[in-house]
């Protein structure tokens, strides 16, 4: 009967919708391990970063006698090339007087070969998922300043110069021209090796900004309003060629000039307070480009079977991008891999006193989980021997308070962490 057909159709639609809304079943039992590749293990010294590979990264220059830092170097001991840095200024015009400025020039040469060689060790720990900090090609140690999103970093693979040549032959806007670099292929091998041990792979991306060495940003700098990517970024004022000085101004993430922000349909100021907001990415081409990159790593060989790809994404500064974009992003990801996992970096509402309520991001249409910094904060205060240690009662109250308003499935899918690349380690 028509009623029966209608009922079956409704049930099918409901099941599909539920599959999109719910976290994947595997996310409830994850034991996480985070890998910051540049600092993990140097398995191939032949691909170590060179001075030219740092172009575009903070502080905006490379000392003449710069070299890779030995793996066992005392962290607080100056490198030989520290000498004279006080006479230089960083991208913001600040003198290079402090250790924390100088140390950002350090590179240790960690790479994907190093990860591959340590997979048996990782498996022996009992982990079930690896969260990789960004692997995209970028000049910094952290890779949140992408030169491009589509390829793995040149210094993480076996042939940096060959990979640079491949990238140069491609049209960044046309996925049909994209090839697999040696670093890309090695990452696919790392995924395969981890999957063989039943270890899931989550890849970190920041769609909120690029680096200043990004191909699209470089075109904007060169061609200004005439650039086909002029609407990709938050440009506040264009340069007037009739004057001797540059009037060009733009928004960088958190005011950092080396991280130009992708433009959204709504501007929200996040310096004083972060809160959820509606909207989308302004340029349809920029959004489509992000979707192409996402598909590339969910299904690297493009055969429709996502088994060879990553199992999801960790999304950087996720609260600083609009909810409308994230809803579309979730649908795109789940259409490629129905079991993919999306985790947002939802952290401060007002630093350093108030953490952001993640509920608006955990209602089935955005993320499966967030990096659980509320759990982190309570756990650190309880387990650390610090002046602000809390009691068992306070710990339990804190945990119950912030889990009580969240869906059960999302609570189980959370990434409960005791440290990350953004906070001190527990020791």
Predicted regions: what they are:
Residues 190-199, 208-209, 217-225, 292-295, ...:
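Active-site-proximal helices and loops of the catalytic beta/alpha 8
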Residues 24, 28, 44-68, 138-158, ...:
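Aromatic- and acidic-residue-enriched segments that line the glycan-binding/catalytic groove
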Residues 409-427:
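Active-site clefts of carbohydrate-active enzymes
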């Amino acid at each position: 009967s028509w009623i029966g057909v209608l009922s079956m159709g409704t049930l099918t639609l409901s099941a599909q919708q539920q599959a999109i809304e719910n976290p994947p079943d595997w996310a409830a039992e994850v034991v996480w391990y985070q890998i910051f590749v540049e600092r993990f293990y140097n398995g191939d010294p032949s691909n170590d970063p060179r001075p030219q590979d740092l172009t575009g990264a903070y502080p905006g220059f490379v000392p003449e006698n710069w070299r890779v830092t030995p793996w066992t170097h005392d962290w607080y001991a100056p490198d030989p090339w520290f000498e004279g840095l006080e006479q230089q200024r960083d991208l913001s015009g600040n003198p290079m007087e402090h250790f924390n400025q100088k140390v950002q020039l350090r590179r240790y040469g960690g790479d994907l070969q190093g990860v591959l060689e340590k997979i048996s060790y990782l498996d022996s720990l009992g982990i079930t998922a690896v969260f990789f900090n960004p692997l995209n090609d970028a000049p910094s140690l952290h890779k949140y300043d992408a030169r491009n999103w589509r390829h793995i970093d040149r210094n993480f693979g076996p042939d940096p110069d060959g990979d640079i040549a491949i990238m140069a032959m491609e049209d960044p806007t046309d996925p049909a021209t994209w090839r697999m670099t040696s670093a890309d292929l090695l990452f696919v091998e790392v995924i395969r090796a981890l999957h063989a041990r039943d270890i899931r792979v989550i890849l970190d991306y920041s769609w909120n900004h690029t680096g200043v060495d990004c191909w699209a940003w470089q075109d904007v700098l060169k061609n200004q309003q005439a650039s086909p990517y002029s609407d990709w970024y938050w440009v506040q004022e264009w340069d007037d060629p009739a004057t001797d000085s540059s009037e060009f101004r733009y928004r960088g993430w958190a005011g950092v000039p080396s991280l130009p922000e992708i433009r959204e349909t709504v501007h929200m100021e996040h310096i004083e307070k972060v809160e959820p907001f509606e909207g989308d990415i302004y340029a349809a081409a920029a959004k489509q480009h992000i979707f192409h990159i996402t598909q590339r790593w969910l299904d690297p060989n493009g055969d429709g079977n996502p088994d060879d790809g990553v199992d999801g994404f960790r999304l950087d500064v996720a609260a600083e991008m609009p909810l409308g974009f994230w809803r579309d992003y979730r649908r795109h990801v789940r259409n490629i891999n129905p079991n993919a996992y999306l985790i947002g970096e939802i952290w401060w509402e007002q630093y350093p006193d108030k953490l952001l309520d993640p509920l608006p991001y955990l209602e089935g249409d955005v993320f499966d989980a967030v990096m659980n910094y509320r759990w982190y904060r309570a756990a650190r205060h309880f387990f650390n021997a610090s002046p602000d240690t809390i009691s068992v009662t306070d710990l339990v109250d804190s945990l119950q308070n912030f889990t009580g308003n969240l869906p059960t499935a999302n609570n189980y899918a959370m990434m409960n962490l005791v440290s990350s690349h953004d906070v001190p380690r527990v020791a």
